[in-house]
Amino acid sequence: LVGSEMCIRDRGRTTPRQRIDALLDKGSFVEMGRLAKMPGNPDNPYGDGVVTGHGTIDGRPVVVYAHDNTVFGGSVGEAFGKKVCAAMDLAIKIGCPVIGINDSGGARVQDAVTSLAMYSEIGRRQYPLSGLSPQISIMLGKCAGGAVYAPVTTDFVVATKDSYMFVTGPDVIRSVTGEDITIEELGSAEKQMEYGNVNYVAEDEYEAFAYVRRLLSFLPTSANDPAPLGRTGLEPEVTDSDLS
């Protein structure tokens, strides 16, 4: 992944691990499947375009995955999908939130049906998490296809103002329907919020991460856990009337 990180740095962007570190408590991230790769070609990159693992936010457990847009455009392949599924299986087992940092072009064309099958497996794991633990999607960059229709089925979607979400792009729509539509009209974050697919639009990814941290501070880790307690500061926890 060194080449990937150099490529991201040259583009002036943050790496998936930097994004995860900005979201989670400092030093809490434990990576899963770092050496996973697609067999058959020794040049296939380790990690397969996604970073997965678990950590904490305000001391509470979360599972997180982040797309690496410099590896096959962040598209979903077999090893990629298996890594995300393993992370989600952990969230189901322990009952904790799942946070996806999405920056992907969707399915990996060269993997054909296998890529689509991985989306099916990811979606199958969203079902037992629904109503059990919060599922949150953070949208960064230009996201298309499965990198959009999977996130919109999660509980909360947070997007940066320069991100885009569409099932297919303007060129395909133009060739199929003859309709001219701009990328802004089709899938800008503001438009997606108007459509009801995005809950909050952040100025940048760091505001998005801060928003998600604050959002989780209001939510229980799972349906089996009590909601977090907040101290309003309006009155002491124990008053004279309580003692009388």
Summary of predicted features, one role per range:
Residues L1-I8:
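Short, small-residue-biased leader/transition segments that mark boundaries at the very start
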